[in-house]
């Protein structure tokens, strides 16, 4: 097999988002002495991990979206963005993960030219939705903490829905070039055989993978992470400053408000950390392979690194519900309630709020909801009006 083709086929199904190669597996490029171990890993361990990722990811994300849709008190700005994250993850879990899993059992690309064009677009769209939504979430936390007078209104929720839709549109548009360049090609194997595979760019083009890997790293990782870092720098600076400049008579109330805001910022930061941890290995591995286009490492160790990077990238689609479950007591109670059939809706039985950008929403045990207006104090000491549903 020519080195170029080998490089294409062995690249990870990660950051280039076109690297789904069910027709070719890293085991095809291993020395014969390593293939027994590789076969065990590929036939037993990897499919089990994929099945676990799909099952856990779908359960967590679908329940998360259901909780937000069925509890009106939770339809806040940050929750809309979190639901957007979950929707993108569900799309990835239902399409890309099963297709990638098939590569360990099929010797040919079985999804045709349409699948070769569509699957890379879906994966890149999902990653775009994730990273751009995390950036929007960080911007929302920045406004909520640095500009505390900007209180959430019903119009803000509608505008956030528009932003979420815009994120999907932008993500799809940025992913369209994947469909343009991806193609099904016939590849010569090591054992004088050949197979069909979906490759992300023409086999003879050595410049394309370098440009592609750098652009993907910048647009889907480095630039958003830089923006998020700037937001959190200002968030941290504001929280530290406000902690030393609170009026004494409002200290107790404002302290609770500050704790709530810090908790919300912490949740978003955990989401960002999970994304970085899961996707960074794929970015590095893809750029390494793109800039060493004419070389290939057929060792078992290299195959394991590739598989770990691939599995990590898909794990990002199921970790957010777990993070929310651990960090939010209210979500944890709602989630447990959803899993217990036959019980009354949790929103009818207990006070609840999950993530609210500024207004505090409560539900009553014994009476219908009614609105009252109260005065509250924000971290800069100003008194503002805040609506509570009791």
Swiss-Prot record:
Regions that span the bilayer: 45-65, 77-97, 118-138, 156-176, 211-231, 267-287, 306-328
An annotated GO BP: antiviral innate immune response
Tissues in which the UniProt entry reports expression: Highly expressed in peripheral tissues where it is detected in the respiratory system, circulatory system, digestive system, urogenital system, lymphatic organs and endocrine system (at protein level). In the testis, expressed mainly in Leydig cells (at protein level).
Cysteines joined through disulfide linkages: 116-198
Phosphoserine carried by residues: 352
Glycan-bearing residues: 8, 16, 192
Record's keyword annotation contains Glycoprotein: yes
Major place of residence: membrane
Protein name as annotated: Neuromedin-B receptor
Species this chain originates from: Sus scrofa
């Amino acid at each position: 097999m020519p080195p170029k083709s080998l490089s294409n086929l062995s690249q990870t199904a990660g950051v280039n988002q076109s690297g789904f190669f069910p027709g070719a597996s890293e085991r095809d490029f291993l020395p014969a002495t390593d293939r027994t171990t590789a076969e065990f890993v590929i036939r037993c361990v990897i499919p089990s991990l994929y099945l676990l990722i799909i099952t856990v990811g779908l359960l967590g994300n679908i329940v998360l979206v259901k909780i937000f849709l069925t509890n009106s008190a939770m339809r806040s700005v940050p929750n809309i963005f979190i639901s957007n994250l979950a929707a993108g993850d569900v799309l990835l879990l239902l399409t890309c993960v099963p297709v990638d899993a098939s590569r360990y059992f099929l010797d040919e690309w079985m999804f045709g030219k349409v699948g070769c064009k569509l699957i890379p677009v879906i994966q890149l769209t999902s990653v775009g939705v994730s990273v751009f939504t995390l950036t929007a979430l960080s911007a929302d936390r920045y406004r909520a903490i640095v500009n505390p007078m900007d209180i959430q209104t019903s119009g803000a929720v509608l505008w956030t829905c528009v932003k979420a839709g815009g994120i999907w549109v932008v993500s799809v548009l940025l992913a369209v070039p994947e469909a343009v360049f991806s193609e099904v090609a016939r590849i010569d194997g090591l054992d004088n055989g050949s197979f069909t595979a979906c490759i992300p760019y023409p086999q003879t083009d050595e410049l394309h993978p370098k440009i592609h890997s750098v652009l993907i790293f910048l647009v889907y990782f480095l630039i958003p992470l830089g923006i998020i870092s700037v937001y959190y720098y200002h968030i941290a600076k504001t929280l530290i400053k406000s902690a030393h400049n609170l009026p004494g008579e409002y200290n107790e109330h404002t302290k609770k408000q500050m704790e709530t805001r810090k908790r919300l910022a912490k949740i978003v930061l955990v989401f960002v950390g999970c994304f970085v941890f899961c996707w960074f290995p794929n970015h590095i591995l893809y750029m390494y392979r793109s800039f060493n286009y004419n070389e290939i490492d057929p060792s078992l160790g290299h195959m394991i690194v590739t598989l770990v990077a691939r599995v990590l990238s898909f794990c990002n689609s199921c970790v957010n519900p777990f993070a929310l479950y651990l960090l939010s007591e209210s979500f944890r109670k709602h989630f447990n309630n959803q899993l217990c059939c036959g019980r009354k809706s949790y929103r009818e039985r207990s006070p609840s709020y999950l993530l609210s950008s500024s207004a505090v929403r409560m539900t009553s045990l014994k009476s219908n909801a009614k609105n009252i207006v109260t005065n509250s104090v924000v971290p800069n000491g100003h008194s503002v009006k805040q609506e509570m549903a009791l």
